[in-house]
């Protein structure tokens, strides 16, 4: 789930940046501090926007920089259990498929793709159904549901487990055929 979060912080403006527009300098500092990092309870920070920097700064003894209060917006992504997502198949392996969810990737275990018995063909890099003859391969567009999000080491992307074994989930081509 994407979130727009309003935040406040203190930004250090180094002396070599004095004279430049405060909001631009603060934006660069905030990007270095937060962007592409995982923050507890907030998720993966994708972008920093709408920076408003206080004109008045604070001097700290022994440091030539000024410190300014800033207000800004962050766009973050947090995978949520039960969320329905769509993405492109990035990789097909004998144990399942990896799906690009945008900022992160998720895994659909082979047992969670469909009710059919599935086989992996490593020569063609596909998974196919024994009875249905349905094929899934790299580049296919799929819809899935998040069934678990496992935290890893701090600062690392979480592992996202997906399922496609529910109505209106699966390869988008299969879903449109079912609707007809």
From Swiss-Prot:
Catalytic reactions on record: RNA(n) + a ribonucleoside 5'-triphosphate = RNA(n+1) + diphosphate
SUPFAM superfamilies membership: N-terminal, heterodimerisation domain of RBP7 (RpoE) (SSF88798), Nucleic acid-binding proteins (SSF50249)
EC number: 2.7.7.6
GO biological process: one example: DNA-templated transcription initiation
Residue ranges of coiled coil: none
Subcellular location: Cytoplasm
EC supergroup of this enzyme: transferase
InterPro entries: NA-bd_OB-fold, RNA_pol_Rpb7-like_N_sf, RNAP_E/RPC8, RNApol_Rpo7, Rpb7-like, Rpb7-like_N, S1_domain
Keywords of this entry: Cytoplasm, DNA-directed RNA polymerase, Nucleotidyltransferase, Transcription, Transferase
The family this protein is said to belong to: Belongs to the eukaryotic RPB7/RPC8 RNA polymerase subunit family.
CC per GO annotation: cytoplasm; DNA-directed RNA polymerase complex
Record note on quaternary structure: Part of the 13-subunit RNA polymerase complex. Forms a stalk with Rpo4 that extends from the main structure.
Role of this protein: DNA-dependent RNA polymerase (RNAP) catalyzes the transcription of DNA into RNA using the four ribonucleoside triphosphates as substrates.
HAMAP family: RNApol_arch_Rpo7
One MF term in the entry's GO annotations: DNA binding
Record's protein name: DNA-directed RNA polymerase subunit Rpo7
Keyword Signal among record annotations: no
Pfam families xrefs: S1 (PF00575), SHS2_Rpb7-N (PF03876)
PANTHER family, per the entry: DNA-DIRECTED RNA POLYMERASE II SUBUNIT RPB7, DNA-DIRECTED RNA POLYMERASE II, III
Gene from which the chain derives: rpo7
Comment block on domains: Forms 2 domains with an elongated structure; Rpo4 packs into the hinge region between the 2 domains.
Residue intervals of the S1 motif domain: 82-165
């Amino acid at each position: 789930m994407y979130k727009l979060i309003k935040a406040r912080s203190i930004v250090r403006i180094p002396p070599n940046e004095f004279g430049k527009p405060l909001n631009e300098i603060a934006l660069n500092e905030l990007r270095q501090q937060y962007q592409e990092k995982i923050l507890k309870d907030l998720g993966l920070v994708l972008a920093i926007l709408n920076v408003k920097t206080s004109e008045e700064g604070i001097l700290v003894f022994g440091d030539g920089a000024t410190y300014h209060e800033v207000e800004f917006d962050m766009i973050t992504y947090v995978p949520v259990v039960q969320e329905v997502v769509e993405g492109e198949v990035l990789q097909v392996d004998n144990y399942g498929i990896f799906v690009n969810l945008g900022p992160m990737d998720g895994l659909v275990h082979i047992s969670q793709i469909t009710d059919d018995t599935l086989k992996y063909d490593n020569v063609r890099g596909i998974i196919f159904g024994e009875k249905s003859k349905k094929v899934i391969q790299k580049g296919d567009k799929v819809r899935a549901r998040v069934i678990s999000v496992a935290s890893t080491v701090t600062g690392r992307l979480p592992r996202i487990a997906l399922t496609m074994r529910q109505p209106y989930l699966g390869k988008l081509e299969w879903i449109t055929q079912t609707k007809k």
